[in-house]
Structure formats: structure tokens, C-alpha cells
């Protein structure tokens, strides 16, 4: 009879209630310990545990058999990857890191960055050559001192032409130059005849530790008899909830009657922060279910409802707009908690989505540490590995998830390299489409029949498309 590895020390799981070694021998011991942690943690919390045979409670007859299995993998990373369910189609997002300090920092908005955020595209007529576009310049960053602006185009880094094979390595440098270029559309709507022309300006960029405020831009737009609030929000970071609430105080003071929420570059973040933002947008649904977090079959008792609230974690009252309709701007980089905002709000109010189809991620994660109850408390000091696996899935009050291929927009517009526009400007294409819809205009939207999509590469941020559960301070 097989011994079941229930691993009682992991059954506590109160964390869900908001809760380099140089010596060779040390390396071997550390690696063995880390692999043991990886398997036991995934066995305890992984959302798709029942789909992975090697995570079954009765998979191994003895500790010796389990140890032999762990020893068959040369690194913790390879072991972790072997435990992922259908990496290409289902679990595209679970992460292992050998430096949880770095992960913690980025989830709090801190990273090594030049302050220039890019999109990359395959050059028309090529299958390997790439050009980049500056999509955002972060304030008070190294890039903000260079004169770069949104929409600037470049095709070289450190003098090397950009290709699909060298782009990642070039971006990994702490210091590099970009060579500006010009996008020539040949005065036609056809993309295939567009050209990227070399320029003569070179810009120096340097990475530094940067704390990013996710509130990138907000303003009031007066249009006929309407007052429209506009907010570009780039990450659900709990440390900025009070500042976000102040933005909504300004919207309330100005008595706005429409809101355009720009999430086109927002790849996710804290579930509680998303719940509080939804409560700022509405207000009339206090204490009703905003979203539901569902765990694996063994952890159903941990399932949790996130309710619309009227206060922040610090007990300050939330400034609520009581809106019945919202406009949300998206791109193919909008993910996770951004998608949850759309999916969960649409159960209560009208959501007009403008832009591109989103990533398609309903699942939530939590940092899992090597400690007795998998929390940060009393963490193993012998290494800095941690996991960020998918542990739960979010559904709205109607038990609907975000489609795995993303949420399709009501009005489909893809950013064009030849016309990015300025963030917050009424002529910026995505915002302009929202303003036209608010006006009830019969004018045709620029639907971009000839679309060019960004090249799929990890951005300058190491960890993206994350929706995570974090211990509450309440």
C-alpha cells in the first residue's frame, strides 16, 4: 500500500488567509534542499496539482523514492518546469526565482530600469530584423533626462542592428545606446511598403534602481457638456492605494460623469488593490461580491470572496464615483488583474473596452517561500529561491473566467508605429475613440485594417502578467 504524502506541515496554509554558495559540497546540499522545497510546495498549493501525476499525494511509496525522483533533476528550475501543467496552453505564468528579494521589489514597483519602456516590431518585409518604439518615459528616471519622448523610433542598440536573436542580450546591459530612426509609411496605408530609415541621433541610457508610481497620468477632459476623467494606471501596486484614492477625490471634486481607465500597459498586480479600484469606480455595490478566488481541489476551504468595499486597508474612506458605465483602454499587454477589472465589473455595469485583445489570464499567484508554512516568516536562510506558482483562479459573481485567449474589445484599435500619439492627448487614437463614443459620434473609428503587432518579447521588467495575493494589513 502506498504511503500518502499529505505533508501536514503544509496543510496549515494560513498564508492564504492573508497570511550562493561557492563550496562544491554546499552547492550539492543547497540544491537538494531547494528541490525538496520545490516539490513539497507545488504538491501543497499548485492550482493544477490534479493534472500533474508527479504531484499526486500517492505518487511515491517512500521518502527514498521521492528523493530519487528529485535527484533525477540537475537543477531546481528543471524540476519546477517538469511539474508545470501544459506550459504552452494552460499554465503560461508560474515562475521560479533564485532571488526572491528582486521579485518582492518588482511587485512593489521597484526594478532596475532606464525609465524608457519599449514596444518592438518586426520590420516590414523582414522576418528577423526589429525596430523599437518608445511607448513610455517614466518621470524622474534616467530616460527622462535624455529628451526621448513617446513614439520615438530606434533600430540599433550599441550600434548593432536589432534582430530576433540579439535583442534580449542587448537589452540586458546596464548601460547602452539606442540609435534613433524614422518610420516612413510611403504615404500609403499598406504596411508592407513601410521603411525604417537610419537617423543620426544616438541616445545614452543607463539602468538604475527605480521606484515606479503606477499612476502615470490623470486629468479632466471637458467635452461639450461632459466632464471626463482620464487615468493611465500601469500596475496594481498596494503601496499607492492612498494616492490612487486621492485621484478619485479629484474626479469627485470635478464632478466627472465619464471615466476612461487606461490599462493598455498594465500587466497586473495585487487583487485587493484591484478590488479597491473597482470600489472607487462604483460605490453602489458595497459588500457585494466583486471577484471570487478559487483554489485547487484540496484547498477549497481557502476559497475567498473579494467584496466591494468602502475603505482602504488603512481604514480611510474610499472616494467612489458611483458610475454605471466605464471605458477601458487595453492592448495585448493588458493582463491579469487588469482583465479581472473588466471581467468582474461587467457583471454590474457597462464596460466599453477599446484597443486590442488582452492576454488571457484568470489565475492568481502568491510568493511561496521555503519555510514551515510557506510564508516569509522563518524562511530558510540557506538560499533565496522562491516560487510564484498559479495557486487559484478568479471568477466574477456569475462564475465567469477571463477567456484563455483574452478579452476581445468592443472597439478594436491597435497602436500604429506611425502614430502613437501622446498619452492623455485628445488626439491619441485610443483615447480619441473613447471620446467619440462618449459623444455618440457617427464618425468612423480608425479600425487599423492593416495592423502591425508588437514582437513577443519579455519587456524590460523581469516579472510580468502577475496577479497576486498579498497579506492584508487590516
Regions found by a protein language model. Give the residues of each.
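Active-site-proximal loop/turn and secondary-structure-junction residues that shape catalytic pockets
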Residues: 209, 265-267
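C-terminal motif of bacterial Sec signal peptides marking the signal peptidase cleavage site
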Residues: 16-19
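Flexible, low-complexity junctional segments that flank or bridge functional domains
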Residues: 21-258, 451-474
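Sec-dependent signal peptide recognition
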Residues: 3-10
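Flexible loop residues that form catalytic
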Residues: 159, 264, 331
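C-terminal "post-core" interaction segments
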Residues: 230-231, 239-246, 251, 258, ...
